[in-house]
Amino acid sequence: VSLPFLFEIGVEEIPDWMIPDALENLRVLFEKLEIPYESVTLDATPRRLVLRAEGLPARQADSQERVLGPAKSAPAQAVEGFARKQGVKPENLAVEATPKGDYYSFIRKVPGRLTKDILAETLAGIILQIYFPKTMYWTGKGGPRFIRPIRWIVAMLGDQIVPFELAGVRSGALTSGHRRLGAKEIAVTPADYVQRLRDHYVVLSAEERRNRIRDGLAGVRLKPDPALLETLVYLTEYPTPIVGSFDPQFLELPEEVLVTVMRHHQKYFSVEDAQGKLAPQFATVMNIDADPEGFVRRGNERVLRARFNDARFFWETDQKKKLANRLPDLAHVTFQAKLGSYRDKTKRIMALVKELGGKALAVRAARLCKCDLTTELVKEFTDLQGVVGGLYARAQGERAEVWQAIYDHYKPESMEDAIPRNLAGRYVSLADKLDTLRGCFRVGMIPTGSRDPFALRRAAQGVVRIIVEGKLDVSLDALLAPDASKHAQPPAPGPRPPAPEPPAPAPPPPAPGPRPPAPGLRPPAPEPPAPAPPPPAPGPWPPAPGPRPPDPLRDFLADRVRFYFKDHRGFQYDEVNAAMAAGWSNLVDLEARLVRIRTLRATPDFEPLAASFKRIRNILVQAGFTGGGAIRQSLLEPGPELELYQEFTQIAGQPIESVISKLRPKVDLFFDKVLVNAPDASVRQNRLTLLHTLLAEFSTMADFSEIVTNS
């Protein structure tokens, strides 16, 4: 028998942004029950989370269970007791070999349980396991926790109620309609559930609510805002769009201010005229069926007028004091308790901008970029920080490069957002984000899987995007090793031991292009009479100048670099790993090498040569060979070995793209005909040196052994 299943959790209004993730979490928890079903549908409104499934069996399938009994060597009495417990005769028992010896065993049939009973035992636990960033007690401390108080639960398998209780709420077949327009109690079944809700002014489907809003505003030129649309979908159960207007005199305020007031504080869409300019209108959604007398529309207009009047007052009042004169006020605005004030942060940003190579205008923008935090407009509308500073700077006569840099310095705020439009803005934004990252990691505020209060992941992703997309030739190794005193708290009275000296900045990797021959390759010369030294002790490949100390910030940023190039730019994961293994301090250089790798990968010689490089690496690691000494020509045997050496001397220093077709057949022939681990120690050493030199030559572009090949 195939049965429909209806499960509804009725609650007080859930925050709109939590609903989609909660639904997906509910799906996962239901699937973990491993109850067969044909299809499952999840829906939600602010007051309910709903799972509907079709095709559940009335009873689970029978199964078998292996029961292990006494050892074969056990007394007959023990064997008979085990058989009696299983309801069979001793001769019906099987003997099974185990790691501990031979044991009697029995395969017994386990009847399938009623699906209704399984659901009754598990649904309460599923409700409490749904993840929300914050939860609350509503029955007293120590009781169940959920995002909002649970008011009713519907749980039905076919036409039968699945009985259970949670926090005093018993499951049943009664749901609730719209808070104002519908009945408080509505009897439902899985078959009529959706229509019964619709009869009581609840549109269950989010897609249907979305279309209802779109269709109702089809004749209005809205400023595109998909995120606001999603917010309104999950704020309402019966959305009905309305359009209002405001005094055109408010259009004298900057558009950014008006749009922010409407969008972030009132959940209104902005409306554009035929020329694409802001019109004195707005659109919003009410959670009722109609507004025939216009009461709701006029109420929204009245609220918006008050908001706009506040914004105009703040705009005019703030401009009586220049941004530069607000700089001392930043000393009273705390950035973070352990990292000082925003005045301290401003000084660090200015120093970093200079370190990055920013000129006078960039330093000027860095000096003023945080001053708008002391303005009344930003205190009231915090989403406008940065933007307001740029607008005030423009109104106060700052040059375009300065005010645009201030305006843009919080960008990019998402992967879809653009980076700052000019070089000064990129320097200021990069310095601001780097300062936040360095400071927070220095005082131990490192993001976890569920907590990132300072949005450090977004800051790190912004660092990567600004450097790569802004083509900034900077060394991250140098920027990630700042003077510790820059983020230290003010010293306490009395002597303090000096801070350790910072490590020297690492030089950026060489730009793509011709390079001098790799170490170990020399022109023909008289050979030393001394025999080749024995191979050095085993060590890592490629050889490193020394172990890098643990650096959580560097590792954190490396993850963001991988994410950017793999998920955002579409490079293969092994391409990213290969290029980063050769160095990633200079992200512009890393991008160029990744483009070259992707181009090379399309050639027929690439994968076989990459497989050969992997083979070379494995040989060197197994031999414990880390380089040293020159290639001795007198020890090279005529044939494939000498030909590989001669080919290499001709192509050394050239980009791999131009030589791959010549190099690959020589490498293949070498491995087919030459025994690397020759019995003669000198010959073996010389062949390892040849392979090491060959691999090192091309490892400045990538560690090709990281490439996954079909070979």
Show where each model-derived region lies.
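Amphipathic alpha-helical "coupling" segments that flank catalytic cores
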Residues: 1-516, 521-711
